[in-house]
Regions:
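C-terminal cap of thioredoxin/glutaredoxin-like
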Residues: 56, 60, 66, 70-159
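Structural alpha/beta surface segment adjacent to cysteine/selenocysteine redox centers
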Residues: 1-78
């Protein structure tokens, strides 16, 4: 999680300066392909606070759950800047959510407190990356093989 990321984003080369990121990108593409998930050629990381606010709002709307898949595709498949209000409004409108209301919510920062609360909870739990699966003080962080997640779930069902 990089809350300090500027609105225009940060190139992955800058974020991981001094490290060879190509092996990491190949590994990520491999994991995504194995999971049957689309994954584009990402060049940047973007500040996702506004996308999180949009998702909080969408949760209050009929059919809003579709926002999660749409935001995933926008970010990981199409490399769309998720801190751009216009792009987020377009994503919401594409799901038949009220684009004007989405813009208003984003411009007025109507869900700022809810997003802040989520970030504070993440800090309290020591969550520093996504995805993170957390339950009963146990966490699985980052892109993990299926077997790791399976062991995590099996452990949870035994306790």
């Amino acid at each position: 999680l990089h809350p300090e990321t500027p609105r225009e984003g940060r190139s992955l080369a800058e974020l991981f300066a001094g490290r060879d990121i190509e092996p990491m990108k190949r590994q990520m593409r491999k994991h995504m392909a194995e999971a049957g998930l689309e994954y584009g050629e990402r060049t940047h990381t973007y500040n996702s606070r506004l996308a999180q606010a949009l998702a909080k709002w969408a949760d209050t709307q009929n059919g809003g759950q579709a926002i999660y898949d749409a935001l995933y595709r926008a970010y990981f498949v199409y490399n769309i800047n998720l801190s751009d209000i216009g792009a987020l409004v377009e994503i919401a409108s594409g799901l038949s959510l009220d684009g004007n209301l989405a813009r208003q919510v984003l411009e007025q920062r109507s869900f700022r407190e809810a997003v802040d609360a989520d970030w504070e909870r993440a800090r309290q739990l020591g969550i520093t990356g996504v995805p993170t699966f957390y339950k009963n003080d146990l966490a699985v962080v980052g892109c993990q093989p299926y077997e790791t997640l399976e062991r995590f779930v099996k452990h949870l069902t035994k306790t």
